[in-house]
């Protein structure tokens, strides 16, 4: 072992330029390999973070070889959820059409702007959200909201997020005439390689219910 190390250091000392170039090339190749493997792992494991992910089905209109996701009307999605016997839970989801101003204290508002996603009450059951505090059982109430664990820490550093309110201004088609939302559940953060990376989910209103023409939903 000592002989090998001695020869190695002798070679490095004698052929400094070549040794440096070889080490740089090896380091670059290794870094490129790691980046490629990280990207491959990201894509291969995309949307596999959900429990029983192999049982999840997403309705989409398009060509078989087309990888795009199509916005759909609300009517046919609701019809399939209600009429197909094999569907245990179903949901639609859509981002609110504009960023909304929220605050945690209406008396001294420090506004932050977010685009919450509107979902059905069973959304958490569909993708298997893991709640660290509270639950989604109150998501059938229009003023309920669930937020991620990291977002709860950000908004409420004292740890009192559950049961607190987020106050908002403005109106939105997906959530009408609601100026405050009660946090009923805090879920474990979802990984980056999934399509549900949002930190806030609110209950979908009845807007465009039974509409078979407007294409605004997933």
Task: Describe the residue ranges of each PLM region.
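Short, strongly hydrophobic transmembrane alpha-helices
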Residues: 14-43
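Mid-to-C-terminal secondary-structure elements
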Residues: 117-133, 143-218
């Amino acid at each position: 072992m000592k002989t090998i190390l001695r020869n190695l250091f002798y070679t490095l000392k004698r052929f400094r330029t070549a040794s440096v170039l070889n080490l740089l090339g090896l380091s670059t190749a290794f870094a490129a390999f790691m980046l490629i493997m990280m990207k491959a792992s990201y894509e291969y494991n995309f949307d596999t973070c959900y429990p029983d992910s192999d049982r999840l089905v997403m309705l989409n209109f398009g060509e078989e070889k087309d990888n795009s996701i199509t916005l759909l009307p609300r009517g046919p999605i609701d019809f399939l959820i209600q009429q197909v016997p094999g569907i245990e839970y179903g949901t639609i989801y859509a981002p609110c059409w504009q960023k909304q101003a929220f605050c945690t204290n209406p008396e001294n508002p420090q506004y932050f702007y977010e685009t919450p996603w509107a979902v059905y009450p069973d959304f958490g059951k569909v993708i298997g959200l893991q709640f660290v505090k509270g639950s989604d059982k109150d998501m059938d109430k229009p003023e309920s909201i669930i937020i991620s664990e990291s977002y709860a820490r950000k908004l409420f550093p004292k740890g009192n997020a559950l049961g607190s309110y987020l106050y908002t201004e403005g109106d939105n088609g997906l959530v009408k005439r609601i100026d405050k939302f009660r946090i009923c559940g805090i879920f474990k953060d979802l990984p980056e390689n999934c399509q549900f990376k949002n930190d806030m989910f609110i209950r979908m209103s009845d807007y465009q219910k039974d509409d078979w023409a407007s294409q605004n939903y997933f």
